[in-house]
Design a protein with these regions (language model features):
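Short, surface-exposed terminal/edge motifs of secreted or surface/virion proteins that either
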Residues: 90-97
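Short linear functional motifs in flexible/disordered or boundary regions
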Residues: 12-13, 97, 128
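Generic structural signal for short, solvent-exposed loop/turn connectors between secondary structure elements
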Residues: 7-10, 98-104
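FAD-binding beta-loop-beta segment adjacent to the flavin cofactor pocket
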Residues: 101-128, 132
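Class I S-adenosyl-L-methionine
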Residues: 1-84, 88-89
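Short amphipathic alpha-helical surface micro-motifs
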Residues: 64-68, 99, 105-107
């Protein structure tokens, strides 16, 4: 929805053309397993879909849940788009959501969040991981 004040007398507004999405979460992932080793999550109360679709999508693809499946407790495919990053929130995958990567689940690394939000790899991320998640969740 787009609104203008009547006194502005704007009559020729046109919506911008649709932009097709070409990237998915997997395009932003860090390749070095050692750099993300502390982000892997393995819990007994993790429930995955039995036959997940392996297709690409321009939407987030939910594959499973942890606990009751609240915010921060959902598991997504890297073949979809990223869910909204959050500056606040809890759950085992707080602030980034969980992603199923190479047969395991994990949160996103702050660098991956930065990439998703459009920051270049040259951008210096603060030392505090929690503060970095808040920054990118507020971007």
């Amino acid at each position: 929805m787009v609104c203008f004040r009547k006194d502005m007398e704007i009559a020729d507004f046109e919506y911008p053309h649709k932009i097709n999405l070409t990237k998915h979460v997997e395009d932003y992932l860090i390749e070095d397993e050692n750099e993300v080793s502390n982000l892997w999550i393995d819990r007994k109360d993790m429930y995955m879909k039995e036959n997940p679709d392996n297709k690409y999508s321009c939407k987030p693809i939910r594959l499973g849940i942890v606990n009751k499946g609240g915010q921060g407790e959902r598991i997504y495919s890297v073949k979809g788009t990223a869910i909204t990053l959050s500056a606040n929130g809890g759950g085992v995958f707080a602030k980034t959501g969980g992603y199923y990567i190479n047969g395991k689940t994990r949160r996103l690394h702050p660098r991956e969040c930065a990439r998703i939000m459009g920051y270049p790899d040259s951008y210096i991320i603060c030392q505090s991981q929690n503060q970095a998640y808040k920054q990118f969740g507020n971007s």
